[in-house]
Amino acid sequence: MSARIRTALDQLVLRTANRLLGRLRRAKSGDDPYHRMFAQFRQMVLVAENPAVLEIGARNVSANHDGRDRFPGVSDYTGVDIHPGQYVDVVADAHQLGKAFPEKRFDFVYSISVFEHLMFPWKAAMEINEILKPGGHVFVATHPAWASHELPWDFWRYLHHSAHSLFNSVTGFEVVAVTEGLPARMFSLVRDPAAQYMHLFQMHQGIAIIAKKVSNYDRERLRWDLVPADVTDTLYPLPATKPAG
């Protein structure tokens, strides 16, 4: 059997399995805990008095909407991204937010599907702490399980306890809430004993975290001077140059 025919048959089997498993899918994910967590954060912003909000990863890549639309009535809203583009107010690296903004500039900082693309996410947590006001909040939505994307700048996946590894007393935070959502299953394509029952274990495609700044991060115990350019000559891909997959 030729490789081309085998590939076509494999695709047929996968499409058939996808249809058979369709009955396990929820009709909509709007009430999923992952989405409810952002609704909770959104309400925190909307009831605050004249909040200053920073969105990390504001460039219009696929959502085709302005993040400002999520927070009607918020006038002090800044969108930052590593590349210039639509809805981007400031071009800056999340690993170097302290160079782009003054200390204690924002009441709220949030990012959606960004932290998996940060080479040094612990450094980003330190930078967020620096530009947040005391008592300010950060919201992070990212993935415990997801297909690789925006290659080669796709580095990390996060589980429930990852929240505390990034946002803790040393980095100057306390975790207010964390939840995983968007349930999924994985089907192994190898017959290894350790993997053949992978489909029986539930995993999640989304994790949402809310953390509060309770202090400045511990500068005596924490220091990270490297930036991505120190260890790679690649850049986060633009749509025109993004590799397939």
Question: Model-found features: residue ranges?
Answer:
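Class I SAM-dependent methyltransferase Rossmann-like catalytic core
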Residues: 3-47
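S-adenosyl-L-methionine-dependent methyltransferase catalytic module, highlighting the catalytic core
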Residues: 119-245
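Short N-terminal micro-motifs specific to bacterial/archaeal maturation
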Residues: 28, 44, 88, 112-115, ...
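Conserved SAM-binding loop
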Residues: 49-149, 159, 164, 211
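Short gly/ser/thr-rich secondary-structure transition/capping motifs
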Residues: 35-37, 91-92, 191-192
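Short N-terminal helix-initiation segments at or just after the protein's N-terminus
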Residues: 14-28, 53-59, 147-160, 235-236
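A conditional alpha-helix N-cap/helix-loop micro-motif detector
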Residues: 31-35, 90, 156
